[in-house]
Amino acid sequence: MSAVITPAEFNDYKVADISLAAWGRRETIIAESEMPALMGLRRKYAAEQPLKGAKILGCIHMTIQTAVLIETLVALGAEVRWSSCNIFSTQDQAAAAIAAAGIAVYAWKGETEEEYEWCIEQTILKDGQPWDANMILDDGGDLTEIIHKKYPAMLDKIHGVTEETTTGVHRLLDMLAKGELKIPAINVNDSVTKSKNDNKYGCRHSLNDAIKRGTDHLLSGKQALVIGYGDVGKGSAQSLRQEGMIVKVTEVDPICAMQACMDGFELVSPFIDGENDGTEASIDKALLGKIDLIVTTTGNVNVCDSNMLKALKKRAVVCNIGHFDNEIDTAFMRKNWAWEEVKPQVHKIHRTGAGAFDAQNDDYLILLAEGRLVNLGNATGHPSRIMDGSFANQVLAQIFLFDQKYADLAPAKKAERLTVEVLPKKLDEEVALEMVRGFGGVVTKLTKTQADYIGVTVEGPFKPDAYRY
């Protein structure tokens, strides 16, 4: 293992450096002041202890903001065991602070793939045996999949999983369709206070930050291609426009494509007439030959494929802000081109062939975070105020599922409850209200007459489930 720890009385952890705990604690205290919804829930439910008896397996980016989430879950009665869902996203001072607080955590920045899986296994196991967990909190679906495939007996006691991100939700829905999902799931990703905050506004803040930290480039006046215009793509395009970049967007969904046009972005395709036949002949080389930066945002595979990578402008920056590293064909890059590490999570990819390279060669791409999440690999991710909404949703989702006690139901009832659903809108509004209060905002209350006129209660929820914010 590459991580080093300092032995102590509590040893159910593995982090990079336990001496970073004081630094992590100082940052956590600051983060708490920027997370009003999460801290509001901590105060609101402290006496009730709604998670007393909950034993939560967590796999989500081990950042300072996650430390606030973990300690909120613990404050509301839960026991937790934690790992990170990405090999580069851990903030080592955050992991150290959690370990120093006596909470089991296995995470450090720069894990290998083998170490990543080992860390997840260590949270599942306690004293060498499967822990008697009864809840899962996941980001991306790796933990959920491992439990289903390697430790299926644990599922008999687990009440459900709350999933943070688009990719993980897709995996859950796929498992449900195939009859493989054995526990109910809450789709946290599609809560309005998650998707509109984290996916859109968070990426607007953190994408340009990561690119500038990784490259020290001035972005203004350069051309960028954003692949995908969902919520993450929207925030990413805004992030680059803020820097003065000339931003183009490519999309497969006509509705998202229309939105890109309406928002003033040029809609293009890296493929001639939009058709990818898998050959270099289908590539719009004139377009890609002018692109200085390409960002993938889709959650799909090979959206920046080998033929596109060959056609990109010399010295173009390539990065991904989707969950996994397969959006960019990094496998092709590793097999066919030479990699030169400039600094951690920044590589020059020499397109002159594999093996030896000329350091003065100018035909290279700059790849950030090895094609993984750039905002967490090259920077510190979304700000605390953004993650406040996402993590408040996670807390409410954990309370909601734990209260349902799925594992204790009769088989017939279990069949009815085996679903992947979003949080009730009333809980989404609860998170939003706490966030508004954190900004010092004042929400106007409906009169009884007004509420009756539009067919809602004075307390809400205020919109139908089908409403698109």
UniProtKB/Swiss-Prot annotation:
Q: Which cofactor does it need?
A: NAD(+)
Q: Where the protein is mainly located, per its record?
A: cytoplasm
EC number annotated for this UniProt entry: 3.13.2.1
Q: Which CDD domains match?
A: SAHH
Pathway(s) of this molecule? Amino-acid biosynthesis; L-homocysteine biosynthesis; L-homocysteine from S-adenosyl-L-homocysteine: step 1/1
Q: What's the record's note on cofactor binding?
A: Binds 1 NAD(+) per subunit.
Provide this UniProt record's keywords sorted from A to Z: Cytoplasm, Hydrolase, NAD, One-carbon metabolism
What is one process in the GO biological process aspect for this record? L-homocysteine biosynthetic process
Q: Name one Pfam family in it.
A: AdoHcyase
Query: What is this protein identified as?
Result: Adenosylhomocysteinase
* Record gene name: ahcY
